[in-house]
């Protein structure tokens, strides 16, 4: 009997202890999340007056309405901006995170001109394992210092040195496309992307990886795999926690991919540092000029030389951050713009004829390389690229995390809100672009651009955090398009609704860009 009593008493004590532990854990969790709940409730109350796309529910917000498929979600977001275009801003709650969508020039200006609202969205943190805290992902004093150091490296006179690389890789691309002349329609997206990757590798790192000739190299495969994994992780909140992410195969693949990319970049940097040291030793020994190796200067060489106001140089980790940032930002966006240009020219033959006429005036029938003077003369092609970026901006939306309360469109928007700027919708404002779905490069003639709101068109963002590489991007786009269009006539029967637009960090066609090629001059070899 005593043993039974002791056993029952022991069980009660264990149950009481377990219950106490659970209660203590629950109380600890409640105490830790209580401030967040208070902050959430305050934001909910303060932002009640901002128009909402639909009824939001506490904690889950509008998540129940959101389409899980990426292409469908982007179309849903665009639908909201069209449905509520008469409103200055609209509000969405993604779980406990408030978002305001901005698609009117006067409201976009408020955010982009602010010297305080420069923090990128929290989603950019998923780029940090690869890019570190480089120019794209850093903020505050680090971003300001780094931006000031790097701006001179994008001066036009320096960019001119990269034109040879662009010409060489564009010619390789043209040769690759030859096999499709007078054949069935083909998907050109991957061809253009590999060309852009070759260009950014050689201009950023001074390394010719030959992606167009060997697209199965480990580095090339890892660059694309890493980009896809980052996009997917951003959309899946259950993968946001690092330790939990590593439980999944993709998390482990991500870790292996990072090692591959960082090892490659570190080796390139170390190799170039060693070469520079040998060059310094050679000249320091009084041996005269270094025997010419015909080695081109790359961004990497500039990064190894730049200093801040106090004369400090970038560390190897700093340099790797920026080189990797150039790699990430410098090929996908440019490749997308070129692909969209080919699609729009292929569906608008009257525009393509005007481009051909301009190319003939500048180049005649020659196949010589494109020069900087040629690029300056290609004014109509420049308008074609601008109009392409209006209709299909390479970056269809981007975000700022508000670092303080501000007023936008007559509404108070609280600190911590994600301000989503949507160039895809902004560029379709009929106040500034009548018949916005029509492709009209003439919109960007100087006489037609007068009086247009400066923030009605922001394909490269604007304000303090605008794209530092936009001149490089436009130079590359014009060079590649000029090389392709001097040789080929482009046709496309693909309808807009067949593209399958997906708005990740880059505006992509899920179904590819399908074109046909004909030789412009039948007597060409």
Swiss-Prot record:
It catalyses: dodecanoate + reduced [NADPH--hemoprotein reductase] + O2 = 12-hydroxydodecanoate + oxidized [NADPH--hemoprotein reductase] + H2O + H(+); tetradecanoate + reduced [NADPH--hemoprotein reductase] + O2 = 14-hydroxytetradecanoate + oxidized [NADPH--hemoprotein reductase] + H2O + H(+); hexadecanoate + reduced [NADPH--hemoprotein reductase] + O2 = 16-hydroxyhexadecanoate + oxidized [NADPH--hemoprotein reductase] + H2O + H(+); (5Z,8Z,11Z,14Z,17Z)-eicosapentaenoate + reduced [NADPH--hemoprotein reductase] + O2 = 20-hydroxy-(5Z,8Z,11Z,14Z,17Z)-eicosapentaenoate + oxidized [NADPH--hemoprotein reductase] + H2O + H(+). Its EC number is 1.14.14.79, 1.14.14.80. GO terms for cellular component: endoplasmic reticulum membrane. Inhibited by N-hydroxy-N'-(4-n-butyl-2-methylphenyl formamidine)(HET0016) with an IC(50) of 38 nM. PROSITE patterns: CYTOCHROME_P450. It is found in: Endoplasmic reticulum membrane. It is a single-pass membrane protein. Its cofactor is heme. One of its GO terms (biological process) is fatty acid omega-oxidation. The keyword Cytoplasm does not apply. The keyword DNA-binding does not apply. Pathway: Lipid metabolism; fatty acid metabolism. The chain crosses the membrane at residues 14-34. Its main location: endoplasmic reticulum. It is an enzyme of class 1 (oxidoreductase). GO terms for molecular function: heme binding; iron ion binding; long-chain fatty acid omega-hydroxylase activity. Belongs to the cytochrome P450 family. A cytochrome P450 monooxygenase involved in fatty acid metabolism in the eye. Catalyzes the omega-hydroxylation of polyunsaturated fatty acids (PUFAs) docosahexaenoate (DHA) and its precursor eicosapentaenoate (EPA), and may contribute to the homeostasis of these retinal PUFAs. Omega hydroxylates saturated fatty acids such as laurate, myristate and palmitate, the catalytic efficiency decreasing in the following order: myristate > laurate > palmitate (C14>C12>C16). This is Cytochrome P450 4V2. The gene is Cyp4v2.
